[in-house]
Amino acid sequence: MPRPPRADEAGGLYHALNRGNLRATIFHKDADFEAFERILHEGLEIHQVELFSFQLMPNHYHLVLRPLVDGEMSRFMGWIGGTHTMRYHSHYHTSGMGHVLSLIHI
């Protein structure tokens, strides 16, 4: 049975989160947290979402955001997740070893 579509309407306020695949660590050192913050800022320049707050933990992160266009939260989450995964694989030389994130958002 397929998963029901996620809510992603313009103007809504959402708590989104994502965690490491198998709850693995995705931020190993301070530089990883800083790189992800840069990814967030770049994503905000590309996608029409407002970010109200965020919390980064070693194996997951939380975002409170509002999409300004229907469907934009999903595009934003996909972009930051994919960009972080590419950076992670490049930095830690794990390319080809599978997904880094579990792709969860509410």
Give the residues covered by each predicted segment.
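A short, aromatic/hydrophobic, helix- or strand-capping loop or linear motif
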Residues: 48, 90-92
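Conserved small/polar residues in nucleotide/adenosyl-binding loops
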Residues: 104-106
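A short alpha-helix capping/helix-loop junction motif
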Residues: 93-102
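An N-terminal domain-cap segment
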Residues: 2-13, 17-58, 64-71, 75, ...
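A common structural junction motif
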Residues: 81-88
